């Protein structure tokens, strides 16, 4: 996972009671509590761009978008996560102030310390959510997105985008221009081959 283990052998109920009094965010994974890695400003900018676009797009609908301060409960996997961005369209989630359970879209903006975990074990845990239709991994360094979409057969299919390709989020009916996702970032570094020429 790449994050320091803080506590072991804690139940989900104990975690919630303990976490209520903490100032920093921590994730709970099957009895273990892990500190969240701090994010770079570029990651925060991209998460904010996505949040703002989704918020505007979903305005007036039953769906709500949340950023990294809202917990997502994955009951079957016995986990609590703080996704960078998530969307839920559930009336039960709308009634719950602190914890969401029915995300249709989960987004993680990758960092070097969490990339392997976000692509592996965390994705496996998220897939246990019956409501989840899409899982988006955003690589700011490569300006690439790996969108995993669940098919009608229950299998997850990768839909990668890179550069100026639009990002199609079918779960919320949004096609996002690449410029909107990467807005306010420094210009993309020139290609290594072009730099030599």
What is each model feature region?
Residues 1-197:
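Gly/Pro/Ser/Thr-rich low-complexity, intrinsically disordered segments predominantly at protein N-termini
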